[in-house]
Design a protein with these regions (language model features):
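Long, contiguous bundles of hydrophobic transmembrane helices that form the permeation core
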Residues: 2-10, 29, 35, 168-307, ...
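Juxtamembrane helix-boundary/capping and inter-helix hinge elements in multi-pass membrane proteins
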Residues: 76-77, 91-94, 127-139, 165-178, ...
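Alpha-helical transmembrane segments of multi-pass membrane proteins
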Residues: 94-109, 132-155, 174-186, 192, ...
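Structural signature of hydrophobic alpha-helical transmembrane segments
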Residues: 1-8, 57-61, 189-193, 326, ...
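Membrane-embedded alpha-helical segments and adjacent helix-loop junctions characteristic
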Residues: 41-127, 291-383
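Hydrophobic alpha-helical transmembrane segments
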Residues: 4-9, 27-30, 59, 63, ...
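N-terminal alpha-helical transmembrane segments of multi-pass membrane transport
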Residues: 1-66, 70-86, 204-217
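C-terminal transmembrane helix pair
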Residues: 188-189, 316, 345-354, 358-371, ...
Length: 454
């Protein structure tokens, strides 16, 4: 049971540091790593653990996509996209809320930073929602819950950790690997249900609060917004098309021309160049080219370091703890304990969803996926759940829940800041969103809902 004690120590240190002392969570994760080194006496392996944390391709992917999101935000391309969406659906009841769901989910997928995305898109969507009758607490939660949904939508960097967890499980159990494109298709299939869930909840709240459409004076002109922003609407195509092609042709067209190894490594490298191509395209379509000179771009990134650093630090320290826990067998011990309880399929799904929800209150989702991902996949597969679906749900049950579940629900606090909403009212309203997220997670994992790509 020592392994479970180590898990308890990690959770306790992060709780005290983050909740008690109000310090950044990445500091808490690093401190937990240091405390665990002292408790377990594994100082001799510290360089190996650091090497594991720094050698993952996740770091480059995170930096590349967050850098792209900085370019999109600073050059006002995001504003153009939001204006186009508002001009199309703002005239319907609750249109500002639907715009927040769609725009925030897309931008959240690019940035991988829930709080940062809330601040970027919420500065436009939250005031628009409030002006049309959304209560402040509801506007804050729509924005925060939609932004954190980006953690489960490709190309979010959280997906890389989930793919790595599936690869680890597949190698250990003799299962054939799937292409990155195929994995992403399944992730989009899963994400579609959660986007629909949020849209339905917005519709329900609009009925309850009698929300109005946006006034004609506030609505952007369709012709003008399309004239300015039509090029920006091609960004999703540029980002998604390589993965769709990889999923469709990885086993035939690419194999015939590149060979099996060439097709395999092409699939693995898609994530590495998509962000760069999209960033170049973003710079090319900017009307005022003086805003994207090398000097201005360098300044953008310099000012955005504070946005990038915390997320990367959490992932690096999480991988370091994951490497240590792998040596200590912590995840395996947890898996053996849960297996001994002889859960039914529904029982196992409820248990894992509950565990990730509770841990998500203090442990970042990316760290959960790194440390426990392969074990969660194995436990779910043992009760009859497709391991590919289990892996595709990891960013959801870990990454999304950690962002919307208080007290670590940083997105809620960011939304409250913009909406100037009351904490008690925002917290109570947020519980509806957390509950709906939990129920839908169970429904998808149980196979009650069909998932495109499976």
């Amino acid at each position: 049971m020592e392994s479970l004690l180590y898990l308890g120590i990690m959770l306790a240190v992060i709780c005290v540091w983050f909740l008690g002392l109000k310090r950044p969570v990445y500091e808490g994760v690093l401190l937990a790593f240091i405390v665990l080194l002292a408790v377990t006496g594994t100082w001799s392996n510290v360089l190996d653990y650091i090497n594991v944390g720094l050698s993952t391709s996740l770091l480059y992917s995170m930096v590349a996509f967050v850098a792209m999101s900085i370019i999109l935000t600073k050059t006002k391309i995001v504003d153009s996209c939001i204006a186009v969406i508002l001009s199309l659906i703002g005239r319907i009841r609750g249109g500002a809320g639907y715009t927040a769901v769609i725009a925030s989910a897309f931008m959240g997928a690019l940035s991988g930073s829930g709080p940062g995305n809330v601040m970027a898109t919420g500065s436009l969507t939250i005031p628009a929602m409030k002006r049309t009758g959304f209560p402040a607490e509801l506007a804050a939660n729509i924005e925060s819950n939609s932004s954190y949904m980006g953690n489960m939508i490709p190309p979010s960097s959280n997906i890389v950790a989930a793919m790595a967890a599936f690869t680890t499980y597949a190698a250990a159990n003799g299962i054939e690997e799937v292409s990155q494109g195929k994995f992403w298709i399944v992730l989009w299939g899963v994400s579609a249900w959660f986007i629909a869930q949020r849209l339905i909840m917005v519709w329900g709240f609009c009925k309850y609060y009698k929300v109005k459409p946006m006034s004609k004076d506030e609505l952007p002109n369709i012709k003008e917004t399309l004239k300015i922003g039509w090029k920006a609407m091609f960004l999703p195509v540029i980002i998604l098309l390589p993965f769709v092609l990889d999923a469709m042709f990885a086993d035939n067209f690419f194999v015939e021309r590149l060979g099996a190894d060439g097709a395999k490594y092409l699939s693995k490298s898609v994530l590495l160049f998509v962000a760069g191509i999209s960033s170049i395209y973003s710079c090319l379509i900017v009307k005022d080219k003086s805003t994207v000179t090398p000097q201005k771009i360098a300044k953008m990134f310099a000012n955005g370091v504070k946005t990038i650093s915390p997320a990367i630090a959490v992932c690096v320290f999480g991988y370091m703890i994951g490497a240590m826990f792998s040596d200590l067998g912590v995840a395996e011990t947890l898996g053996e304990l849960m297996t001994s309880w002889s859960f039914s399929k529904l029982g196992m799904v409820l248990a894992i969803c509950a565990i990730t929800c509770v841990m998500g209150a203090v442990v970042p989702g990316s760290s959960q996926v790194v440390i426990f991902g392969p074990v969660f996949i194995s436990l779910l597969a043992n009760v009859g759940i497709d391991p590919l679906l289990a892996a595709a749900m990891l960013p959801c049950i870990c990454g999304v829940m950690c962002g919307i579940t208080p007290p670590l629900g940083l997105g809620m606090y960011a939304g409250m800041t913009i909406a100037q909403s009351d904490f008690s009212k925002t917290f109570k309203n947020n519980m509806w969103w957390v509950g709906a997220q939990f129920i839908l997670q169970v429904a998808v994992l149980m196979g009650w809902l069909p998932v495109f790509g499976m």
